[in-house]
């Protein structure tokens, strides 16, 4: 996982009123059938070590459910993936900020978006990887079987995270994009 110069600063959205977004849960058995029947794109997006893999944290966890990431040490949760060389994500915190870094496979449109629900204290990272498969008419792809069209990882924000000053950057190479998100702490003197 490497960062390169020439990063694109992503807009962090705060007003997303998509009805029914992430309302269809991705169950363990559904995910296993989906992944076993899929091709290389599905495995690149949802495979071992990916930020969007339901098995990223050692056991199954639906990525559309908010996870309290910063309550855990990356070294502990990712130890087995790191020992196998399959880890493409990392997170940490300093006195000033919370930081998330992740490789994101370049598949399909790869339109990574970051949303923050300031009141609900949740950050979500999502994007559409399969624009060829049509969602139901008059429906947003995130409102149905979202995993057939895109990906998501929802994260609970710590109580001292100042989400309104968050920054996200994306840099690209041939096979992966590198995403870095920085969320300052409320009492930090250094807002980005």
UniProtKB/Swiss-Prot annotation:
GO-annotated cellular components: cytoplasm
Transmembrane segments: none
Taxonomic superkingdom: Eukaryota
Domain sHSP, first and last residues per copy: 80-192
Keywords: Cytoplasm, Stress response
Keyword Cytoplasm: yes
Protein name per the record: 21.7 kDa class VI heat shock protein
Organism encoding this protein: Arabidopsis thaliana (Mouse-ear cress)
Gene behind the chain: HSP21.7
């Amino acid at each position: 996982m490497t960062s390169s110069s020439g990063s694109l600063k992503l807009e962090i959205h705060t007003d997303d009123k998509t009805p029914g977004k992430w309302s269809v849960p991705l169950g363990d058995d559904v995910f296993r059938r989906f992944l076993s029947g899929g091709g290389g794109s599905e495995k690149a997006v949802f495979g071992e070590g990916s930020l969007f893999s339901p098995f990223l944290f050692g056991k199954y966890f639906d990525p559309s459910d908010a996870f309290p990431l910063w309550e855990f040490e990356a070294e502990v949760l990712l130890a087995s993936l790191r020992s196998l060389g399959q880890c493409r994500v990392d997170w940490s915190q300093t006195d000033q900020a919370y930081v998330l870094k992740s490789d994101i496979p370049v598949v399909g449109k790869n339109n990574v978006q970051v949303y923050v629900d300031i009141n609900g204290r949740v950050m979500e990272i999502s994007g559409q990887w399969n624009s060829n498969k049509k969602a139901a008419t008059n429906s947003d792809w995130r409102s149905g079987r979202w995993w057939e069209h895109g990906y998501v990882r929802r994260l609970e924000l710590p109580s001292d995270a100042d989400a309104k000053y968050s920054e996200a950057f994306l840099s690209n190479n041939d096979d992966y994009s590198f995403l870095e998100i920085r969320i300052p702490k409320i009492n930090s003197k250094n807002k980005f």
